[in-house]
Amino acid sequence: MEHNGSASNADKIHQNRLSNVTEDEDQDAALTIVTVLDKVAAIVDSVQASQKRIEERHRVMENAIKSVQIDLLKFSQSHSNTGYVINKLFEKTRKVSAHIKDVKARVEKQQTHVKKVEAKQEEIMKKNKFRVVIFQEEVQCPTSLSVVKDRSLTESPEEVDEIFDTPVDLSSDEEYFVEESRSARLKKSGKERIDNIKKAFSKENMQKTRQNFDKKVNRIRTRIVTPERRERLRQSGERLRQSGERLKQSGERFKKSISNAAPSREAFKMRSLRKTKDRAVAEGPEEVREMGVDIIARGEALGPISELYPEALSETDPEEASATHPPQEGGEVSTPEPLKVTFKPQVKVEDDESLLLDLKQ
């Protein structure tokens, strides 16, 4: 008994030890699971935060792309406006060049006139003997004075000295020199302006300005839209165009199929004929006579209705014909009785105009 009691005590102690060990292991496992779950939760939170950041970046990128598109539209509008303004400037330069040519021709004419006047003045100054006659009549005096040169001055100057008095000093030379200086100034200023305009609107300068403008435009384009993105946009446009063409083709095919599937007017007419024939057969010979159908037998034999109108009869018509005309014994086919066919005037049957054919065997 004592031995059994000691054995039972030992078993209890061993079981207690095992239970303690299992409890410790369970606690350790629970702790590890909790730590792992915490790590997983931290990872999930970090992933969600990164996803939110990515979404925000995508929104920012979309806004930037929209702003870039708006800038592109504005730039295209400004580019078109600048092109229009440049064309106007070219037209104005052409007009200015034509006006400059006219002014140049006028200046040359004035220059020749001035040279002639200078030559005359030199001759007069060399001789220093001229006379100015001033008189007034009923007509108003002209504002400009005309200097008359007498031929006798060149022939005999000594006789002229005896005849004429000393010339009056009218200080006309000083006035003329002032006018000559003004004309020279105008001439110089006109030439300088013409030269400046020619230099500004020369072919070389215009080509340089065009090249610089094209370079700036290309730089702005490459900064705003890369060539890869431009190629992608072009490909997407081609795809959209192809899809539109396919949709058009499918719509045309659908229309054709509907038009082919729709019954024709002849089919409606044949159906109306069949309905009238069925009504006439159902009503009987008396009602047909009342309607005014005149059937008279003739010597000519007509074939069955299926031969006359093969398209109008349906699949059940041959069966009805076989029921109404059963084949005779010995393989002989019964010939139908002769008929007279009468046509009525046009009558509307179900809103379709057709000729009614009344047949009776």
From Swiss-Prot:
Localization per Swiss-Prot or TrEMBL: Cytoplasm, Myofibril, Sarcomere; Cytoplasm; Cytoplasm, Cytosol; Cell membrane, Sarcolemma
Region (Disordered) location: 1-21, 230-283, 310-346
Sites of Phosphothreonine modification: 335
Phosphoserine: modified positions: 152, 171-172, 354
Pfam families per UniProt: PTRF_SDPR (PF15237)
Coiled coil: 100-124, 204-248
Compositional bias (Basic and acidic residues): 230-255
Main location: cytoplasm
Any one GO CC term of the record: cytoplasm
Keyword check for Phosphoprotein: yes
Record's keyword terms, sorted: Activator, Cell membrane, Coiled coil, Cytoplasm, Developmental protein, Differentiation, Membrane, Myogenesis, Phosphoprotein, Transcription, Transcription regulation
Xref: InterPro entries: Cavin_fam
Protein origin, superkingdom: Eukaryota
BP term (GO), one: cell differentiation
Task performed by this protein: Modulates the morphology of formed caveolae in cardiomyocytes, but is not required for caveolar formation. Facilitates the recruitment of MAPK1/3 to caveolae within cardiomyocytes and regulates alpha-1 adrenergic receptor-induced hypertrophic responses in cardiomyocytes through MAPK1/3 activation. Contributes to proper membrane localization and stabilization of caveolin-3 (CAV3) in cardiomyocytes. Induces RHOA activation and activates NPPA transcription and myofibrillar organization through the Rho/ROCK signaling pathway.
Family: Belongs to the CAVIN family.
Subunit annotation: Component of the CAVIN complex composed of CAVIN1, CAVIN2, CAVIN3 and CAVIN4. Interacts with CAVIN1, ADRA1A, ADRA1B, MAPK1 and MAPK3. Interacts with CAVIN2; this augments the transactivation of NPPA.
Name the record gives this protein: Caveolae-associated protein 4
